[in-house]
């Protein structure tokens, strides 16, 4: 069975001031798909974390290298897949998870290890997260539409009649 997918691709300079463009695009795509407000906010946080990690860490220490962050939105009928990739420095994801250990409700903010919270947020807010660290880092995240799906056209029609 072939699934229909719409692909939206963007590349931004690896600079913090461009992460907002990705957030705005994501918000529009997710809204059009029918995600509810809370889900859109979760998506924006997770994607912002992935982009910010790329901006802050990927090209650190690479003299004069202006890197870029590539973001792909794969729009399916039942889910949104988002891939954030850079070609900068990579890291050992499994080792990083082991070093940081699990976060629990018993931890206070002061007890949290510096770094790694972004990965935790991505894993908490998204349905699926996969990190590949080869030549650069690629973070693939998936969020499924749930039963509270908003019918965008019906919502607009209701608004226009009220």
Swiss-Prot record:
<dbReference type="GO" id="GO:0016989">
    <property type="term" value="F:sigma factor antagonist activity"/>
</dbReference>
<dbReference type="InterPro" id="IPR036890">
    <property type="entry name" value="HATPase_C_sf"/>
</dbReference>
<protein>
    <recommendedName>
        <fullName>Serine-protein kinase RsbW</fullName>
        <ecNumber>2.7.11.1</ecNumber>
    </recommendedName>
</protein>
<dbReference type="InterPro" id="IPR050267">
    <property type="entry name" value="Anti-sigma-factor_SerPK"/>
</dbReference>
<comment type="function">
    <text>Negative regulator of sigma-B activity. Phosphorylates and inactivates its specific antagonist protein, RsbV. Upon phosphorylation of RsbV, RsbW is released and binds to sigma-B, thereby blocking its ability to form an RNA polymerase holoenzyme (E-sigma-B).</text>
</comment>
<comment type="similarity">
    <text>Belongs to the anti-sigma-factor family.</text>
</comment>
<keyword id="KW-0808">Transferase</keyword>
<keyword id="KW-0547">Nucleotide-binding</keyword>
<dbReference type="Pfam" id="PF13581">
    <property type="entry name" value="HATPase_c_2"/>
</dbReference>
<keyword id="KW-0067">ATP-binding</keyword>
<keyword id="KW-0418">Kinase</keyword>
<dbReference type="InterPro" id="IPR010193">
    <property type="entry name" value="RsbW"/>
</dbReference>
<dbReference type="GO" id="GO:0005524">
    <property type="term" value="F:ATP binding"/>
</dbReference>
<dbReference type="GO" id="GO:0004674">
    <property type="term" value="F:protein serine/threonine kinase activity"/>
</dbReference>
<dbReference type="GO" id="GO:0106310">
    <property type="term" value="F:protein serine kinase activity"/>
</dbReference>
<keyword id="KW-0723">Serine/threonine-protein kinase</keyword>
